[in-house]
Amino acid sequence: MKTRDMNRDWIATAETLSSALPYLQRYDDAIVVIKLGGHAMGSDEGMESFARDVVLLRQVGVNPVIVHGGGPMINALLDKLQIKSEFVNGKRVTDAATMEVVEMVLSGMVNKRIVQAINAQGGKGIGLSGKDANLITCEATDPALGFVGTPSEVNADMLKNLFEKEFIPVIAPIGSGTAGETFNINGDTAAGAVAAALKADRLLLLTDVAGVKNAEGVVVTELKAADVEEMTAAGVIAGGMIPKTETALAAVRGGVRACTIVDGRVPNAVLLELFTDHGAGSMIRS
Protein backbone atom coordinates (compact mmCIF):
# COMPACT_ATOMS: atom_id res chain seq x y z
CA MET A 1 0.00 0.00 0.00
CA LYS A 2 1.34 3.43 -0.94
CA THR A 3 0.85 6.46 1.26
CA ARG A 4 1.67 10.10 0.68
CA ASP A 5 1.55 13.13 2.94
CA MET A 6 0.20 16.25 1.27
CA ASN A 7 2.84 18.93 1.78
CA ARG A 8 2.68 22.63 1.12
CA ASP A 9 4.81 22.48 -2.02
CA TRP A 10 2.39 20.11 -3.74
CA ILE A 11 -0.59 22.20 -2.71
CA ALA A 12 1.13 25.36 -3.95
CA THR A 13 1.85 23.66 -7.28
CA ALA A 14 -1.81 22.70 -7.67
CA GLU A 15 -2.91 26.23 -6.80
CA THR A 16 -0.49 27.66 -9.37
CA LEU A 17 -1.85 25.38 -12.09
CA SER A 18 -5.42 26.26 -11.16
CA SER A 19 -4.77 30.00 -11.17
CA ALA A 20 -3.19 29.73 -14.63
CA LEU A 21 -6.40 28.38 -16.19
CA PRO A 22 -7.85 31.77 -17.29
CA TYR A 23 -4.56 32.65 -18.97
CA LEU A 24 -4.31 29.25 -20.67
CA GLN A 25 -7.81 29.78 -22.05
CA ARG A 26 -6.96 33.32 -23.16
CA TYR A 27 -3.91 32.19 -25.11
CA ASP A 28 -5.39 29.10 -26.72
CA ASP A 29 -4.36 29.24 -30.41
CA ALA A 30 -2.69 32.61 -29.79
CA ILE A 31 0.47 33.65 -31.64
CA VAL A 32 3.33 34.73 -29.38
CA VAL A 33 6.56 36.01 -30.92
CA ILE A 34 9.56 35.78 -28.60
CA LYS A 35 12.80 37.64 -29.27
CA LEU A 36 15.62 35.82 -27.48
CA GLY A 37 18.55 38.20 -27.12
CA GLY A 38 22.11 36.95 -27.19
CA HIS A 39 22.73 38.25 -23.68
CA ALA A 40 19.63 36.41 -22.43
CA MET A 41 20.73 33.00 -23.71
CA GLY A 42 23.06 32.39 -20.80
CA SER A 43 24.17 28.94 -19.77
CA ASP A 44 23.17 25.55 -21.15
CA GLU A 45 20.86 25.21 -18.14
CA GLY A 46 19.22 28.54 -18.98
CA MET A 47 18.75 27.49 -22.60
CA GLU A 48 17.24 24.19 -21.47
CA SER A 49 14.80 26.04 -19.21
CA PHE A 50 13.81 28.43 -22.01
CA ALA A 51 13.30 25.55 -24.45
CA ARG A 52 11.13 23.71 -21.92
CA ASP A 53 8.94 26.80 -21.51
CA VAL A 54 8.57 27.18 -25.28
CA VAL A 55 7.60 23.53 -25.72
CA LEU A 56 5.07 23.92 -22.91
CA LEU A 57 3.53 26.87 -24.76
CA ARG A 58 3.09 24.69 -27.83
CA GLN A 59 1.60 21.87 -25.74
CA VAL A 60 -1.11 24.13 -24.26
CA GLY A 61 -2.15 25.48 -27.65
CA VAL A 62 0.02 28.57 -28.11
CA ASN A 63 1.81 29.13 -31.44
CA PRO A 64 5.29 30.38 -30.44
CA VAL A 65 7.77 31.91 -32.87
CA ILE A 66 11.36 32.52 -31.78
CA VAL A 67 13.46 35.29 -33.32
CA HIS A 68 16.95 35.34 -31.86
CA GLY A 69 19.94 37.60 -31.62
CA GLY A 70 23.53 36.66 -31.01
CA GLY A 71 25.50 39.85 -30.45
CA PRO A 72 27.98 38.46 -27.89
CA MET A 73 28.72 35.44 -30.11
CA ILE A 74 29.19 37.68 -33.16
CA ASN A 75 31.51 39.97 -31.22
CA ALA A 76 33.57 37.02 -30.00
CA LEU A 77 34.16 35.69 -33.52
CA LEU A 78 34.83 39.16 -34.95
CA ASP A 79 37.42 39.72 -32.22
CA LYS A 80 38.99 36.35 -32.96
CA LEU A 81 39.19 37.29 -36.65
CA GLN A 82 40.39 40.81 -35.73
CA ILE A 83 37.48 42.49 -37.52
CA LYS A 84 36.46 45.72 -35.79
CA SER A 85 32.80 46.64 -35.19
CA GLU A 86 31.07 49.99 -34.89
CA PHE A 87 27.55 50.72 -33.63
CA VAL A 88 25.19 53.61 -34.43
CA ASN A 89 22.09 53.94 -32.22
CA GLY A 90 22.39 50.32 -31.18
CA LYS A 91 22.70 49.03 -34.76
CA ARG A 92 25.86 47.28 -35.95
CA VAL A 93 27.64 48.83 -38.95
CA THR A 94 27.94 45.84 -41.28
CA ASP A 95 30.46 45.70 -44.12
CA ALA A 96 30.86 42.66 -46.39
CA ALA A 97 33.38 40.90 -44.14
CA THR A 98 31.25 41.48 -41.06
CA MET A 99 28.13 40.27 -42.89
CA GLU A 100 29.75 36.91 -43.58
CA VAL A 101 30.56 36.47 -39.90
CA VAL A 102 27.10 37.62 -38.79
CA GLU A 103 25.36 35.10 -41.06
CA MET A 104 27.73 32.32 -40.03
CA VAL A 105 27.09 32.89 -36.33
CA LEU A 106 23.34 33.58 -36.45
CA SER A 107 22.19 31.06 -39.05
CA GLY A 108 24.71 28.40 -38.12
CA MET A 109 25.81 28.41 -34.50
CA VAL A 110 23.08 30.23 -32.58
CA ASN A 111 20.04 29.12 -34.56
CA LYS A 112 20.91 25.45 -34.38
CA ARG A 113 21.67 25.63 -30.67
CA ILE A 114 18.14 26.88 -29.99
CA VAL A 115 16.54 24.37 -32.36
CA GLN A 116 18.44 21.52 -30.75
CA ALA A 117 17.42 22.65 -27.27
CA ILE A 118 13.73 22.77 -28.26
CA ASN A 119 13.86 19.37 -29.92
CA ALA A 120 15.60 17.88 -26.88
CA GLN A 121 12.52 18.85 -24.85
CA GLY A 122 10.18 17.05 -27.24
CA GLY A 123 9.27 20.02 -29.43
CA LYS A 124 9.42 20.37 -33.21
CA GLY A 125 11.82 23.26 -33.62
CA ILE A 126 12.69 24.23 -37.18
CA GLY A 127 15.54 26.60 -37.98
CA LEU A 128 15.09 29.36 -40.55
CA SER A 129 16.67 32.60 -41.59
CA GLY A 130 14.83 35.47 -43.20
CA LYS A 131 16.33 34.35 -46.52
CA ASP A 132 14.40 31.06 -46.54
CA ALA A 133 11.34 31.22 -48.82
CA ASN A 134 11.71 35.03 -48.79
CA LEU A 135 10.59 34.99 -45.17
CA ILE A 136 11.91 38.53 -44.57
CA THR A 137 12.53 40.88 -47.49
CA CYS A 138 14.55 43.98 -46.65
CA GLU A 139 15.54 47.41 -47.81
CA ALA A 140 18.83 49.04 -46.82
CA THR A 141 18.32 50.96 -43.60
CA ASP A 142 21.01 53.58 -44.12
CA PRO A 143 24.04 53.54 -46.45
CA ALA A 144 26.18 54.52 -43.46
CA LEU A 145 25.27 51.23 -41.77
CA GLY A 146 26.31 49.06 -44.72
CA PHE A 147 24.43 45.77 -45.05
CA VAL A 148 21.88 46.55 -42.36
CA GLY A 149 18.32 45.98 -43.47
CA THR A 150 14.86 47.15 -42.50
CA PRO A 151 12.10 44.57 -43.14
CA SER A 152 9.71 45.59 -45.91
CA GLU A 153 7.75 42.34 -46.20
CA VAL A 154 7.31 39.17 -44.11
CA ASN A 155 6.00 35.87 -45.50
CA ALA A 156 3.47 35.27 -42.72
CA ASP A 157 1.68 32.50 -44.65
CA MET A 158 4.74 30.26 -44.45
CA LEU A 159 4.83 30.60 -40.67
CA LYS A 160 1.11 29.87 -40.40
CA ASN A 161 1.63 26.70 -42.44
CA LEU A 162 4.27 25.62 -39.93
CA PHE A 163 1.86 26.28 -37.05
CA GLU A 164 -0.64 23.87 -38.61
CA LYS A 165 2.01 21.11 -38.45
CA GLU A 166 2.89 22.08 -34.84
CA PHE A 167 6.38 23.27 -35.74
CA ILE A 168 8.09 25.94 -33.65
CA PRO A 169 9.85 28.35 -36.05
CA VAL A 170 13.25 29.64 -34.90
CA ILE A 171 14.30 32.59 -37.07
CA ALA A 172 17.77 34.09 -37.53
CA PRO A 173 17.47 37.84 -38.31
CA ILE A 174 19.06 37.70 -41.74
CA GLY A 175 17.08 39.06 -44.68
CA SER A 176 17.20 39.27 -48.46
CA GLY A 177 17.21 42.38 -50.60
CA THR A 178 15.28 42.65 -53.85
CA ALA A 179 18.58 42.54 -55.77
CA GLY A 180 19.79 39.43 -53.97
CA GLU A 181 21.71 41.18 -51.20
CA THR A 182 22.04 39.69 -47.74
CA PHE A 183 21.17 42.01 -44.86
CA ASN A 184 21.79 41.94 -41.14
CA ILE A 185 18.60 42.90 -39.29
CA ASN A 186 18.50 44.13 -35.72
CA GLY A 187 16.97 41.19 -33.85
CA ASP A 188 14.38 43.32 -32.08
CA THR A 189 13.38 44.94 -35.36
CA ALA A 190 13.03 41.54 -37.05
CA ALA A 191 10.91 40.21 -34.19
CA GLY A 192 8.65 43.25 -34.33
CA ALA A 193 8.17 42.90 -38.08
CA VAL A 194 7.31 39.21 -37.75
CA ALA A 195 4.89 39.93 -34.91
CA ALA A 196 3.15 42.71 -36.86
CA ALA A 197 2.85 40.57 -40.00
CA LEU A 198 1.27 37.77 -37.97
CA LYS A 199 -0.91 40.19 -35.97
CA ALA A 200 0.50 38.37 -32.94
CA ASP A 201 -1.29 38.44 -29.63
CA ARG A 202 1.96 39.16 -27.82
CA LEU A 203 5.56 40.11 -28.54
CA LEU A 204 8.08 39.33 -25.82
CA LEU A 205 11.56 40.86 -26.04
CA LEU A 206 13.80 38.79 -23.77
CA THR A 207 16.93 40.64 -22.73
CA ASP A 208 19.39 40.93 -19.84
CA VAL A 209 17.78 43.90 -18.08
CA ALA A 210 14.76 44.01 -15.80
CA GLY A 211 12.75 46.27 -18.12
CA VAL A 212 12.26 49.95 -18.88
CA LYS A 213 13.39 52.10 -15.96
CA ASN A 214 12.21 55.59 -15.06
CA ALA A 215 14.48 58.49 -14.12
CA GLU A 216 14.78 57.09 -10.58
CA GLY A 217 15.96 53.71 -11.88
CA VAL A 218 12.74 51.91 -11.00
CA VAL A 219 11.28 49.43 -13.51
CA VAL A 220 7.98 50.63 -15.00
CA THR A 221 5.66 47.63 -15.40
CA GLU A 222 3.13 49.20 -17.80
CA LEU A 223 3.55 52.02 -20.31
CA LYS A 224 1.50 53.66 -23.02
CA ALA A 225 3.06 54.76 -26.30
CA ALA A 226 2.98 58.36 -25.12
CA ASP A 227 4.97 57.41 -22.00
CA VAL A 228 7.69 55.81 -24.12
CA GLU A 229 7.93 58.84 -26.41
CA GLU A 230 8.17 61.22 -23.46
CA MET A 231 10.86 59.16 -21.70
CA THR A 232 12.88 58.87 -24.92
CA ALA A 233 12.72 62.62 -25.57
CA ALA A 234 13.92 63.23 -22.00
CA GLY A 235 16.86 60.85 -22.43
CA VAL A 236 15.55 58.43 -19.81
CA ILE A 237 15.27 55.71 -22.44
CA ALA A 238 18.64 55.60 -24.19
CA GLY A 239 21.32 53.38 -25.74
CA GLY A 240 20.43 49.76 -26.45
CA MET A 241 16.95 50.20 -24.99
CA ILE A 242 15.96 52.54 -27.85
CA PRO A 243 15.72 49.81 -30.55
CA LYS A 244 13.61 47.73 -28.14
CA THR A 245 11.11 50.47 -27.37
CA GLU A 246 11.01 51.51 -31.04
CA THR A 247 10.23 47.89 -31.89
CA ALA A 248 7.52 47.77 -29.24
CA LEU A 249 5.86 50.94 -30.54
CA ALA A 250 5.98 49.79 -34.16
CA ALA A 251 4.57 46.40 -33.20
CA VAL A 252 1.60 47.63 -31.19
CA ARG A 253 0.80 50.23 -33.83
CA GLY A 254 1.02 47.45 -36.41
CA GLY A 255 -1.64 45.35 -34.71
CA VAL A 256 0.19 43.44 -31.96
CA ARG A 257 -1.94 43.51 -28.80
CA ALA A 258 0.97 44.19 -26.43
CA CYS A 259 4.75 44.02 -26.27
CA THR A 260 6.70 43.27 -23.11
CA ILE A 261 10.41 43.83 -22.53
CA VAL A 262 11.21 40.85 -20.30
CA ASP A 263 14.20 39.98 -18.12
CA GLY A 264 15.20 36.72 -19.78
CA ARG A 265 17.54 35.89 -16.91
CA VAL A 266 14.57 35.22 -14.64
CA PRO A 267 13.71 31.49 -14.53
CA ASN A 268 10.52 30.72 -16.48
CA ALA A 269 10.21 34.39 -17.47
CA VAL A 270 8.01 33.58 -20.47
CA LEU A 271 5.54 31.61 -18.35
CA LEU A 272 5.52 34.28 -15.66
CA GLU A 273 4.70 36.96 -18.19
CA LEU A 274 1.94 35.08 -19.99
CA PHE A 275 0.30 32.98 -17.31
CA THR A 276 0.49 34.97 -14.05
CA ASP A 277 -0.71 38.29 -12.69
CA HIS A 278 2.85 39.18 -11.70
CA GLY A 279 4.43 39.46 -15.13
CA ALA A 280 8.16 39.75 -15.70
CA GLY A 281 9.02 43.10 -17.27
CA SER A 282 7.66 46.27 -18.87
CA MET A 283 4.50 45.95 -20.94
CA ILE A 284 3.90 48.51 -23.69
CA ARG A 285 0.47 49.07 -25.23
CA SER A 286 -0.77 51.55 -27.80
Curated annotation (Swiss-Prot):
GO terms for cellular component: cytoplasm. Its main location: cytoplasm. It is found in: Cytoplasm. Its EC number is 2.7.2.8. Pfam families: AA_kinase. Pathway: Amino-acid biosynthesis; L-arginine biosynthesis; N(2)-acetyl-L-ornithine from L-glutamate: step 2/4. CDD domains: AAK_NAGK-C (cd04250). InterPro entries: AceGlu_kinase-like_sf, AcgluKinase_fam, ArgB, Asp/Glu/Uridylate_kinase, Glu/AcGlu_kinase, NAGK-C. One of its GO terms (molecular function) is ATP binding. The record marks K35, K244 as: Transition state stabilizer. Keywords: Amino-acid biosynthesis, Arginine biosynthesis, ATP-binding, Cytoplasm, Kinase, Nucleotide-binding, Transferase. The keyword Membrane does not apply. GO terms for biological process: arginine biosynthetic process via ornithine; L-arginine biosynthetic process. It catalyses: N-acetyl-L-glutamate + ATP = N-acetyl-L-glutamyl 5-phosphate + ADP. The keyword Nucleotide-binding applies. It is an enzyme of class 2 (transferase). Substrate binds at G70, G71, R92, N184. It comes from the Bacteria. Catalyzes the ATP-dependent phosphorylation of N-acetyl-L-glutamate. Belongs to the acetylglutamate kinase family. ArgB subfamily. This is Acetylglutamate kinase. The gene is argB.
